[in-house]
Amino acid sequence: MVRGKIEIKKIENVTSRQVTFSKRRSGLFKKAHELSVLCDAQVAAIVFSQSGRLHEYSSSQMEKIIDRYGKFSNAFYVAERPQVERYLQELKMEIDRMVKKIDLLEVHHRKLLGQGLDSCSVTELQEIDTQIEKSLRIVRSRKAELYADQLKKLKEKERELLNERKRLLEEVNMHHSSKGNTEGGHRTKHSSEVETDLFIGLPVTRL
């Protein structure tokens, strides 16, 4: 029988939680022992239950393993600390540069809007004037492009309307021409019938 997948979440029932803790703890220590024996590794496992009770397993003396771990952690921290501090310092310098750049851009933007010009020198005002002229040229160029595009679309629409008008006029003329031919045929037939009626019978002899 296939067992369903157990959802990993806190077990609310206290009795079930204690039973599961006991089973999982035993399984954990068993796996730790197997790892130690099979791979000739130093293994230590420390578990505190919810009630605060200590449970532990070690392949050798727990104190020696913990002491070894402490020395390794301290050595790793000491070796990595200068690199971390240098990275943080570089990051701080980069942030300072970005803040200064943003401040300069904000000041320049205000000057382009005509604000804070009292402290500007003649050279700065000339640079601002040049920048404004450049911006105006860009705006005018873009405006001309939009107008040209709009004019092109209007001309295309005008051409479509003229073609449609021409087509409708041709249809109207064809309709009138066809109607006129039909009425002319009717009139010719009627005249023939009238003339036939007039000449039927013997000619009258005059005295």
From Swiss-Prot:
GO molecular function: DNA-binding transcription factor activity; protein dimerization activity; RNA polymerase II transcription regulatory region sequence-specific DNA binding
InterPro entries named among the record's database cross-references: MADS-box/MEF2_TF, MEF2-like_N, TF_Kbox, TF_MADSbox, TF_MADSbox_sf
GO cellular component term of the entry, any: nucleus
Entry-linked PROSITE patterns: K_BOX, MADS_BOX_2
Any one of the GO BP annotations: regulation of flower development
Domain MADS-box: 1-61
Subcellular location: Nucleus
Mutant phenotype after disruption: No visible phenotype under normal growth conditions.
Name this protein carries in UniProt: MADS-box protein AGL71
Upper taxonomic lineage: Eukaryota, Viridiplantae, Streptophyta, Embryophyta, Tracheophyta
Protein task: MADS-box transcription factor that acts with AGL42 and AGL72 in the control of flowering time. Promotes flowering at the shoot apical and axillary meristems. Seems to act through a gibberellin-dependent pathway. Interacts genetically with SOC1 and its expression is directly regulated by SOC1.
Keyword check for Transcription: yes
Keywords: Developmental protein, Differentiation, DNA-binding, Flowering, Nucleus, Transcription, Transcription regulation
PANTHER family reported for this sequence: SERUM RESPONSE FACTOR HOMOLOG
Domain called K-box: residue spans: 88-178
Keyword Transcription regulation: yes
SUPFAM superfamilies: SRF-like
